[in-house]
């Protein structure tokens, strides 16, 4: 079963141009760790496995572990979590020694914890519903409860 977090990432990759047209989207995505900076969503290159701004292979592909080190130095825990979920190697932590308070064990726990906070779940749901293309929205009914909205979003994203 795909998680709502994974469904959100899948939707962001597919419809990122439409979603990014809305000014408040950037701030919400930055807080959720789906954004590296204020201009680009993190995508994984399908050819070399490195991080890319477009998802396509180019000379600008960045090693995910370099981004992990930078995220740890900036103490961006949400970005660290996102990078680890995308396949970053937690053993690179030893390069930082005592510069931050995160230990190897804490990072391992981040990797194994696939849950997201309720506040973040609400933000993802409302953000995605508001940014969905009209074709998908027409097939969905606006739900009054958060549980109903989550269910509708998952059905929309996972439908063949």
UniProtKB/Swiss-Prot annotation:
Q: In which domain of life is the source organism classified?
A: Viruses
Similarity remark: Belongs to the asfivirus MGF 300 family.
Q: What does this protein do?
A: Plays a role in virus cell tropism, and may be required for efficient virus replication in macrophages.
Name of protein = Protein MGF 300-2R
